[in-house]
């Protein structure tokens, strides 16, 4: 029995073609349901990394159903990893994109929804972007997309709400480079003190994504230190988040 307010994910098998992937699902009542794509499978990327775990917790606490999963060949998921061990190159992601689509199908069936929000972290951001045109995805969130070494220029063509989070000290996600890839209507949040792992900024990361989910494509009501949108940046809007050092408040699930 799950008590009211208790955070308890359920282990699920996610079908991806002929193989089964390991996943963790938590039910919720608010739209949209959210699927979370983890980082690079040969660099320790799994659904249990702190960023994915924090996002699943924060989004679930806000009332949204979540599904996080492991790619083929990772953890208890069937299949094999096709990437070269030890490489930081993204390479062919067709298999991982299929895995994401399988997870989306599972989440749609579980929630009886028509669309999901697809959230990708690092390598997972490339996977989400590759599937962004799918009708089953109505908005995307990209956390620390590795724009150094991978082509994210397709971001300009995404005609759906987009939220991007950039860490100020991430050598794979240069904020200036990322700004040049954003299209009209995108929202970009910068956490200057964070690195690629967001270990000291996990609460801020979770809160920013939850706030954006609540407002959709509108600017989240956060610690906004840029009073006006940048007028020369292609129509996207940017906010800057700073660690206030204060405890993170409980989220109100009734609004």
Listing of model-derived features with the role each one plays in the protein:
Residues 14-113:
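Serine-hydrolase catalytic machinery in alpha/beta-hydrolase-like enzymes
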């Amino acid at each position: 029995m799950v008590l009211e307010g208790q955070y308890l994910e359920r282990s699920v098998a996610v079908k991806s073609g002929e193989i089964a992937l390991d996943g963790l699902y938590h039910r919720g009542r608010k739209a949209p349901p959210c699927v979370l794509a983890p980082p690079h499978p040969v660099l320790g990327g799994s659904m249990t990394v702190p960023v994915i775990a924090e996002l699943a917790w924060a989004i679930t606490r806000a009332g949204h159903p979540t599904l996080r999963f492991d790619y083929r060949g990772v953890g208890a998921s069937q299949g094999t990893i096709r990437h070269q061990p030890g490489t930081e190159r993204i390479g062919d992601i067709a298999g991982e994109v299929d895995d994401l689509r399988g997870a989306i199908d599972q989440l749609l069936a579980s929630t009886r929804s028509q669309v999901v929000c697809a959230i990708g972290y690092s390598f997972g951001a490339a996977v989400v972007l590759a599937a962004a045109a799918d009708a089953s995805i109505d908005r995307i969130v990209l956390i620390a997309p590795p724009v150094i070494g991978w082509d994210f220029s397709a971001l300009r063509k995404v005609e759906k709400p987009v939220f991007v989070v950039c860490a100020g000290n991430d050598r794979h996600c240069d904020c200036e480079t990322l700004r040049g890839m954003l299209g009209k209507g995108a929202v970009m949040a910068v956490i200057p003190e964070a690195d690629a792992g967001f270990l000291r900024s996990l609460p801020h990361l979770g809160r920013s994504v939850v706030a954006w989910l609540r407002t959709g494509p509108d600017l989240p009501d956060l610690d906004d230190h840029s009073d006006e949108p940048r007028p020369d940046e292609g129509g996207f809007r940017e906010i800057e988040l700073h660690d206030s050092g204060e405890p993170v408040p409980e989220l109100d699930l009734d609004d």
